Amino acid sequence: MIFSPPLHHATLIKRYKRFLADVITPEGETFTLHCANTGAMTGCATPGDTVWYSTSDNPKRKYAHSWELTHTQQGDWICVNTLRANTLVREAIEQNLVNELSGYSKISSEVKYGSESSRIDLLLQAEDRANCYIEVKSVTLLQQQRGYFPDAVTLRGQKHLRELLSVVESGQRAVLFFAVLHSGIEQVAPAHHIDERYATLLAQVQQLGVEVVCYGAKLSPDGIYLCDKLPFFID
């Protein structure tokens, strides 16, 4: 995924009200960015970090600029725009970069499914195999050299796990895909210490057939690309 038009950078002053952040440019201009991330963003929004942002030409937008990347003072790159994860995973599948998800002839996004009024992020289909339902999650929380999900209690995430299990029970394939969008993360685990119910439920549905796939990414102001498969651990 290439950023076009190119991103620009500024220094983070503060993030607030979840969806907003104030920054200051190298020229001394201050303004407010939109932040498309509902999570806690722990370690991703420290005042003084470098923020890379995109700019929309839509005149109806209240905030023209969107926070895309953080370059931390420790040197890590993080994609904080969670809307990018689905695009990254779809591109990687279409380019046959994810071995676990190859061999399908059709890919669709945001398809309604399940008994709890959900929409699956990606649906893979082929004539010679069962449908594959993929729920994509962005991982950015780094603690003690390990990436954790979620970074806040997520009832919606728990619902998605139940829906994925129902897919498996219907004889189809269900995949929970962790897109690791933090350059410092080398392995992933469920965050028992943040959302114990989610972590317990994830362990249960994995044992019952929901697949878990984790891939890291190369991140820069030029673009983001999924690359290496990363290990997933249930402690």
From Swiss-Prot:
Domain of life of the source: Bacteria
Coiled-coil segments: none
Record CDD domains: SfsA-like_bacterial
Any one GO molecular-function label of the UniProt entry: DNA binding
NCBIfam families: sfsA
HAMAP family, alphabetized: SfsA
Family under the similarity heading: Belongs to the SfsA family.
Protein name: Sugar fermentation stimulation protein homolog
Species of provenance: Serratia proteamaculans (strain 568)
